[in-house]
Swiss-Prot record:
Highest taxon listed in the record's lineage: Bacteria
SMART domains per UniProt: Ribosomal_S10 (SM01403)
Keyword tRNA processing appears in the UniProt entry: no
Keyword terms: Ribonucleoprotein, Ribosomal protein
Name of this chain's protein: Small ribosomal subunit protein uS10
BP terms from Gene Ontology: translation
Alphabetized GO MF terms: structural constituent of ribosome; tRNA binding
Taxonomic classification: Bacteria, Bacillati, Bacillota, Clostridia, Eubacteriales
Subunit structure: Part of the 30S ribosomal subunit.
Keyword Acyltransferase: no
Role played: Involved in the binding of tRNA to the ribosomes.
Family as reported in the entry's similarity comment: Belongs to the universal ribosomal protein uS10 family.
This protein's GO CC annotations: ribonucleoprotein complex; ribosome
C-alpha cells in the first residue's frame, strides 16, 4: 500500500517570515493528526546584480546588489481530509510563495 504525501515548498526573501509560516503549517498539520517531516532548509539562492554607478565613463566605479531567496520543504505523510481542509483555511503572509504537490 502506497502512502499518500503532500509536499509543500516555501520560498521567501525574508527568512523570519518564512520560518514563522513553516511553523504555522507544521502546527496546523500536527493538530489535525498528520505526521510531519520538516521543515527542511533548502539551499539559499543568491542573485547578484552589478551595475555602473556613473552614466557614461568611470567603468571602475560599480555597485553590487544581491537578493537572497530562502527555501523550506515540508512533507505531510498520510494527510486526512481534516488536515487538507485546515491547510486550505490557513492564512499566511503575502511575502511567502507556496508550492503544493500531492
Amino acid at each position: 500500500m502506497s502512502k499518500q504525501k503532500i509536499r509543500i515548498r516555501l520560498k521567501a526573501f525574508d527568512h523570519t517570515i518564512l520560518d514563522q509560516s513553516a511553523e504555522k503549517i507544521v502546527e496546523t498539520a500536527k493538530t489535525s493528526g498528520a505526521k510531519v517531516v520538516g521543515p527542511v532548509p533548502l539551499p539559499t539562492e543568491k542573485d547578484v546584480v552589478t551595475i555602473l554607478r556613473a552614466v557614461h565613463k568611470y567603468k571602475d566605479s560599480r555597485e553590487q546588489f544581491e537578493i537572497r531567496t530562502h527555501k523550506r520543504l515540508i512533507d505531510i505523510v498520510n494527510p486526512s481530509p481534516k488536515t487538507v481542509d485546515a491547510l486550505m483555511r490557513l492564512n499566511l503572509p503575502a511575502g511567502v510563495d507556496i508550492e503544493i504537490k500531492l
